[in-house]
């Protein structure tokens, strides 16, 4: 396991020498994330952290390759323009908004490796925790969906260290919103990309805390009856892929809003296999049905507008199976949506 600092050579895009200064792209704004007091002094509001690990996918019998995604998602995002609203809102502050915190790597030699995933999750969690404590929003770039347990641990650590009371009853109610075709609450003798939310449930139960989990885009063809039984036992809020397609937006939005209202802070995670394989072919477990990108964007904006999101991540992009960088570009668009909505909500 290792951490590499941000490779700023990935942050490139087109030049606009004949346009006004408002022809800005994200590659022109990104800086190294400073894991010290200067991040607060400089006003860094966003910290990107890569989780270059797909050991969990391998353990979950999936198709590997997601560990190569973080730099490619960054590259696709870097070339996107900065919207006018952000330029107006943060005039004079733009170069300090976004920091790249580099990548956590899992050196498993493309084979099953004991403890490598677990150590990578802990090291990734440490970066997430530091960014939260410094007042920023950490956004993880996977990698497999085992990133989810690391994101949660980072949030949990930050809450433990910032809470003045040792009494866990005083902790804010954590809500998890996951866009995913899979529930990811499998039983297994080791951690995998299919177990993170069961692990989170067990962690919270040990701490006497409730498990508030809403999974959006769940496919009945991607989860066994045993998993749906476990979801019922754990009290999981499920919005199926068919609901996302067939129900009116107002009804779905009300369900999401009710969940948001029931918690104090939110961990938002997007498994890119929630989208149809025709839209994102490059994922670890492609979906035959999926939910529309327009729906995901609309729901993400609703969630971000609550002001409760404290950590977010995007997982399961697999460049090995991508076509014309299509999947990385969709991930970059969702990353931009999260960043834009978070900053505009400050």
UniProtKB/Swiss-Prot annotation:
Mn(2+) 2 binds at residues 180, 182, 271, 273. GO terms for biological process: L-histidine catabolic process to glutamate and formamide; L-histidine catabolic process to glutamate and formate; putrescine biosynthetic process from arginine, via agmatine. Disulfide bonds: none annotated. Its cofactor is Mn(2+). Keywords: Histidine metabolism, Hydrolase, Manganese, Metal-binding. The keyword Manganese applies. It catalyses: N-formimidoyl-L-glutamate + H2O = formamide + L-glutamate. InterPro entries: HutG, Ureohydrolase, Ureohydrolase_dom_sf. Its EC number is 3.5.3.8. Binds 2 manganese ions per subunit. It holds the Pfam family Arginase. GO terms for molecular function: agmatinase activity; formimidoylglutamase activity; manganese ion binding. SUPFAM superfamilies: Arginase/deacetylase. It is an enzyme of class 3 (hydrolase). Mn(2+) 1 binds at residues 145, 180, 184, 271. Pathway: Amino-acid degradation; L-histidine degradation into L-glutamate; L-glutamate from N-formimidoyl-L-glutamate (hydrolase route): step 1/1. Belongs to the arginase family. Catalyzes the conversion of N-formimidoyl-L-glutamate to L-glutamate and formamide. This is Formimidoylglutamase. It comes from Psychrobacter cryohalolentis (strain ATCC BAA-1226 / DSM 17306 / VKM B-2378 / K5).
């Amino acid at each position: 396991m290792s951490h590499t600092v941000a490779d700023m050579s990935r942050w490139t895009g087109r030049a606009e020498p004949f346009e006004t200064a408002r022809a800005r792209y994200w590659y022109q704004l990104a800086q190294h994330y400073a894991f010290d007091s200067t991040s607060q002094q400089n006003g860094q509001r966003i910290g990107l952290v890569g989780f270059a690990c797909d050991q969990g996918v391998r353990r979950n019998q999936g198709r590997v390759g997601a560990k190569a995604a973080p730099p490619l998602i960054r590259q696709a995002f870097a070339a996107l323009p900065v919207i006018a609203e952000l330029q107006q809102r943060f005039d004079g502050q733009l170069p300090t908004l976004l920091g790249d915190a580099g990548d956590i790597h899992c050196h498993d030699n493309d084979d099953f490796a004991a403890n490598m995933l677990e150590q990578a999750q802990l090291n990734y969690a440490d970066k997430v925790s530091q960014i939260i404590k410094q007042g920023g929003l950490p956004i993880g770039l996977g990698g497999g969906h085992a990133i989810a347990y690391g994101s949660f641990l980072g949030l949990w650590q930050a809450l433990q260290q910032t809470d003045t009371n040792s009494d866990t009853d005083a902790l804010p109610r954590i809500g998890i919103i996951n866009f995913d075709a899979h529930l990811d609450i499998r039983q297994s003798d080791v951690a995998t990309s299919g177990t993170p939310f069961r692990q989170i449930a067990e962690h919270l139960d040990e701490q006497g805390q409730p498990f508030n989990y809403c999974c959006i885009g769940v496919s009945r063809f991607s989860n066994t009856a045993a998993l749906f039984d476990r979801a019922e036992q754990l009290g999981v809020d499920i919005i199926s892929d068919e609901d996302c397609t067939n129900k009116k937006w107002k009804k779905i939005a009300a369900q999401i809003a009710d969940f948001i209202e029931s918690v104090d802070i939110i961990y938002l995670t997007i498994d890119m296999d929630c989208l149809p394989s025709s839209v994102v072919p490059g994922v670890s477990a492609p979906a035959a049905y999926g939910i529309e990108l327009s729906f995901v964007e609309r729901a993400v904006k609703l969630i971000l507008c609550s002001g409760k999101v404290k950590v977010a991540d995007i997982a399961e992009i697999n460049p090995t199976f991508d076509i014309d960088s299509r999947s990385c570009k969709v991930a970059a668009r969702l990353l931009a949506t999260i960043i834009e909505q978070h900053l505009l909500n400050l």
